[in-house]
């Protein structure tokens, strides 16, 4: 899959350098994936959850939430947000 809009995670890594490895591992898996639907995503990431039009991944042991929009038809992932668990829970990202 082609991963677009990585600036959200670059900003998060600048704030927490320990994110670099786990987000890099996620990216490595995602860019080589050919997912056709959420069921296929969950074979690799069982805790990936659909939230409206987005898919949410736990990153760094659940400390962070990676929010993406996956266009399976075009094999493209748009990174929307990389938030701490607390930021995610506040829900402002949904607007």
Whereabouts are the PLM-identified features?
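Basic, Lys/Arg-enriched alpha-helical interface segments
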Residues: 1-63, 71-76, 86-95
């Amino acid at each position: 899959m082609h991963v677009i809009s990585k600036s959200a995670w670059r900003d998060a890594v600048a704030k927490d350098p320990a994110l670099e490895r786990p987000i890099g591992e996620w990216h490595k898996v995602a860019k080589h994936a050919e997912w056709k639907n959420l069921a296929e995503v969950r074979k690799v990431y069982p805790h990936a959850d659909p939230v409206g039009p987005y898919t949410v991944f736990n990153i760094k042991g659940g400390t962070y939430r990676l929010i993406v929009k996956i266009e399976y038809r075009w094999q493209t992932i748009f990174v929307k947000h990389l938030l701490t668990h607390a930021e995610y829970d506040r829900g402002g990202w949904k607007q």
